[in-house]
């Protein structure tokens, strides 16, 4: 399985791809929010071993990821969006548990 994490920002997106075994495929691919940038991502996704599942994830920003979502849907890629507030609460809650145990 491939895990694709995309950092969403106002002017560009940054992509990280790894396998379930921890092999890094792409460490920091900067994608412009243009057709060319999205095609760069699509070509990278298509170059991956198609026998493996691809899991694409990013934080929901409300607006900045809209073009990316439409592009992924149009090209038959599913994705998961995470609420950044919930992610932050989850992380801080788990870090608290670790601190308490130590």
Predicted features and spans:
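Phosphate- and other anionic-substrate recognition elements at nucleic-acid/protein interfaces
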Residues: 1-102
